[in-house]
Amino acid sequence: MAFWDEKTLAQMNTEEWESLCDGCGKCCLNKLIDDETEELYYTNAACQLLDNKAGHCKSYEQRFNFVPSCTKVTVDNLESLTWLPDSCAYRRLLQGRELPSWHPLRTGSKEAMILAGMSVAGKVTCETKIRDIEDHIVLWPMKDVE
């Protein structure tokens, strides 16, 4: 039985917790909230540290030094991070759902995740190159595939 099936999120050690992250990069996308409806919108504007080709952070260990607003996902704040996509392993497990078939912990690589269209790799623009972020609202980050 896999550790994510045996343990609660709170019981996981640091290595297990970190391995739950599939590296999709969706959490690194700029998000907008409509002032009137409070609806959340994802954009294809990515954090300046996101590697567009690989779809992951170029400076993960030092990211808070460069981007102080970067959010560290923890067991203590997970429930309040309602902007995490439905495909996020942390969110899925919190909701009592399984890891999807494409998750790197199940497949051994990120290839299935990329083939399932779950990675931001090749789909984003660096936030520093965008003028009007409202023109960059996209729906694909909300996609969730079992």
UniProtKB/Swiss-Prot annotation:
Belongs to the UPF0260 family. This is UPF0260 protein Spea_2441. Pfam families: CxxCxxCC (PF03692). InterPro entries: Puta_zinc/iron-chelating_dom (IPR005358), UCP006173 (IPR008228). NCBIfam families: PRK05170.1-4, PRK05170.1-5, PRK05170.2-5. It comes from the Bacteria.
